[in-house]
């Protein structure tokens, strides 16, 4: 795995993917299956209408509004709808809260079920067989070795297996020292990885 298959050459992987996508895009346009305007619209959707920035919006709302947090943990899909967030791959979302006693991490062992509306497209490592199998067997060791995140021995780790029926999202703990911060400032601390559970929200 870590030659680093999880974290390994994100740049290299990205270059390969970009080249393949461009080749496929050109072929589909040439065959009249897609148009450039259709492709631009899809890019706009994934840039502005779904993605981690929307997940961060949900997290910050939960950090700053206790009543919203209760609703989010009770029914994540409906609570997200309050913020205008939902849609494809977001029909059934369950949010699980990190606390001083327990840390949650998400995987999809069968395929790559993933809450697109709040996290965007899944990172490559999330779909790797090595991540999917190892996080179930030895989550503490994997988080430390692959993501540089050491969960204290006293803290329980729970692994949640997403499926087409239920997609899990982690509500990270709010970092200390952020009292009085604006929602915009708090949102900068929330990462896609922290909502999957492979790292905490950014420290202040």
Swiss-Prot record:
Pfam families: NHase_alpha. It is an enzyme of class 4 (lyase). The modification Cysteine sulfinic acid (-SO2H) is found at residue 111. Its EC number is 4.2.1.84. It catalyses: an aliphatic primary amide = an aliphatic nitrile + H2O. Binds 1 Co(2+) ion per heterodimer. GO terms for molecular function: cobalt ion binding; nitrile hydratase activity. Co(2+) binds at residues 108, 111-113. One of its GO terms (biological process) is nitrile catabolic process. Industrial production of acrylamide is now being developed using some of these enzymes. It comes from the Bacteria. The modification Cysteine sulfenic acid (-SOH) is found at residue 113. SUPFAM superfamilies: Nitrile hydratase alpha chain. Keywords: Cobalt, Lyase, Metal-binding, Oxidation. Its cofactor is Co(2+). Optimum temperature is 60 degrees Celsius. NHase catalyzes the hydration of various nitrile compounds to the corresponding amides. Belongs to the nitrile hydratase subunit alpha family. Heterotetramer of two alpha and two beta chains. This is Cobalt-containing nitrile hydratase subunit alpha. It comes from Pseudonocardia thermophila.
């Amino acid at each position: 795995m870590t030659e680093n298959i999880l974290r390994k050459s994100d740049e290299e992987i990205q270059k390969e993917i970009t080249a393949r996508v461009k080749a496929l895009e050109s072929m589909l346009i040439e065959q009249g299956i897609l148009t450039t305007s259709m492709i631009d619209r899809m890019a706009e959707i994934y840039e502005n209408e779904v993605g981690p920035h929307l997940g961060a919006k949900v997290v910050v709302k939960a950090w700053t509004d206790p009543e919203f947090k209760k609703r989010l943990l009770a029914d994540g899909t409906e609570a997200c709808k309050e913020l205008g967030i939902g849609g494809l791959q977001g029909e059934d979302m369950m949010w699980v809260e990190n606390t001083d006693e327990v840390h949650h991490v998400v995987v999809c062992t069968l395929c790559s079920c993933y809450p697109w509306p709040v996290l965007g497209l899944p990172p490559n490592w999330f779909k790797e067989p090595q991540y999917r199998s190892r996080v179930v067997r030895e989550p503490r060791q994997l988080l430390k070795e692959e993501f540089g995140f050491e969960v204290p021995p006293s803290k329980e780790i729970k692994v949640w297996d997403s499926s087409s029926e239920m997609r899990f999202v982690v509500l990270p703990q709010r970092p200390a020292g952020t009292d009085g911060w604006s929602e915009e400032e708090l949102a900068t601390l929330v990462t896609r990885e922290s909502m999957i559970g492979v790292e905490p929200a950014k420290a202040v």
